[in-house]
Amino acid sequence: MEKTAIKNFAIEARKILMRSAEVQAGLYGVTKNGCSNPIQKGAGFEVYQTVAGTENRIYGEDISKRRDLVDAVNEIGFAQVMEKAAYTWFNRLIAIRFMEVNDYLPTRTRVLSSATGSKTPDIVTEYREVNLNLNDEDLEKVQMCIKENKYDDAFEYLFVKQCKELKRVLPKLFKKTDDYMELLLKLSYINDGVVRMLVDTIPECNFNVQDEGQVEIIGWM
């Protein structure tokens, strides 16, 4: 078992997910300095000024998710919410990696990698055939992302859908999370980050039960 590699990954992944969550929160006017009010709002939409000074217009469910995020920050603090988000998504990434390597996923389709060795995860190339209970709106969203070459957006959307489906069969492992957690997630299989680190730097044998592989995540503090 590559304990050193696993330890280094766990430490770096935590930092990356924490920073990413903070950046995502900033897109909704939520920072360690407070939660801003919308600079504009109307029927079904709100506009927030981001940390970078740009404007972010949100609609529908994202409005209620943002409201829940603000409530959580006010209740337990900004740092604690970011830590919770990082910890939650880290655990799910590890669980899904373990399941896909051992072919334990109900869909039998890899989520973070490809059985062919391609950099593009199988869930992105085979989403039409994968049973994730995607409705027409879901399919349209994924198709639009791919059409616009926003492959990471399609990947992240499908990853979240997979987590929700796994909650049905593994409710203890994939407990229902606060919906605002989705606002704090930003994943990429194309660029360097947690997914590439997990797939490229931790040998599959460390996850494969047939090779007596078992992951011990060290340094998650």
Predicted regions and their residues:
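Preference for the N-terminal adenyl/adenosyl cofactor-binding alpha/beta module
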Residues: 1-221
